[in-house]
UniProtKB/Swiss-Prot annotation:
Superkingdom to which the source organism belongs: Eukaryota
Domain note: The presence of a 'disulfide through disulfide knot' structurally defines this protein as a knottin.
Protein's name according to its UniProt entry: Trypsin inhibitor 1
Disulphide bridges: C4-C21, C11-C23, C17-C29
Sample GO molecular function, one term: serine-type endopeptidase inhibitor activity
Residue positions where Pyrrolidone carboxylic acid is found in the record: Q1
Similarity-based family: Belongs to the protease inhibitor I7 (squash-type serine protease inhibitor) family.
Subcellular location, principal: secreted
Keyword entries, A-Z: Disulfide bond, Knottin, Protease inhibitor, Pyrrolidone carboxylic acid, Secreted, Serine protease inhibitor
Feature type site, description Reactive bond: R6, I7
Lineage: Eukaryota, Viridiplantae, Streptophyta, Embryophyta, Tracheophyta
Naturally occurring in which organism (per UniProt): Lagenaria siceraria (Bottle gourd)
Amino acid sequence: QRRCPRIYMECKHDSDCLADCVCLEHGICG
């Protein structure tokens, strides 16, 4: 199970996101 804090973060790449979050199509970490 991925550990992804539920924090609103804009992103361009997965590396912009925290922990195991990835950058989704709409430019938000999730």
